[in-house]
Amino acid sequence: MAGFKQLSGLVVPLDAANVDTDAIIPKQFLQAITRVGFGKHLFHEWRYLDVDGTKPNPEFVLNYPQYQGATILLARKNLGCGSSREHAPWALADYGFKVMIAPSFADIFYNNSLNNHMLPIRLSEEEVEEIFQWVWANESKQIHVDLEAMTVTVGDKVYTFELDEFRRHCLLNGLDNIGLTLQHEDKISAYEKNIPAFLR
């Protein structure tokens, strides 16, 4: 898994609070257990005018031409509330989002996003409002996220954010739970060699 250090990308301004995981990925699309293929169903009930997902809703922000190819999602408070389905960050990642910015995230969704190598950034409501206003006034312009410096640069303004150092280390180095374990492979092997034969 590639490490995440910096990203310059388009921002989709999803002007909604309390966006729950059922809105992010509706329950009828949860049958699969692999992480791919969910992007086409992201925000399905808002994004499409029909059940089959063949008629895009022109009034939904993800369908606006100026936001195609966006890699950063901007939202209001309590993003990812509701059920704890891990399919929600899977769908966001499969669509192409790498960063989410909001005043707050539901705890399980926040951790699931980090586990799936996405960066959820918490900024104050005032800072998020400033970014919304900038994005609306500067459509099709990119912002810059720097995980090493822990900053978000929007136009000529720089915002700082916080992230647990362990989580930051994992993102910077592209480490998931398996990768973290393999960092200690030599110690695991040494321990296993000392296990009595009758316990192996």
From Swiss-Prot:
Molecular-function GO terms, alphabetical: 3-isopropylmalate dehydratase activity
Keywords, ordered alphabetically: Amino-acid biosynthesis, Branched-chain amino acid biosynthesis, Leucine biosynthesis, Lyase
Stretches assigned to coiled coil: none
GO terms classed as biological process: L-leucine biosynthetic process
Catalytic activity: (2R,3S)-3-isopropylmalate = (2S)-2-isopropylmalate
Record-level GO cellular component terms: 3-isopropylmalate dehydratase complex
CDD domains registered for this protein in UniProt: IPMI_Swivel
Enzyme Commission number(s) from the entry: 4.2.1.33
Keyword Magnesium: no
Pathway(s) where this gene product acts: Amino-acid biosynthesis; L-leucine biosynthesis; L-leucine from 3-methyl-2-oxobutanoate: step 2/4
One matching Pfam family: Aconitase_C
Family per similarity comment: Belongs to the LeuD family. LeuD type 1 subfamily.
Assembly description: Heterodimer of LeuC and LeuD.
Function of the protein: Catalyzes the isomerization between 2-isopropylmalate and 3-isopropylmalate, via the formation of 2-isopropylmaleate.
Protein name, as recorded: 3-isopropylmalate dehydratase small subunit
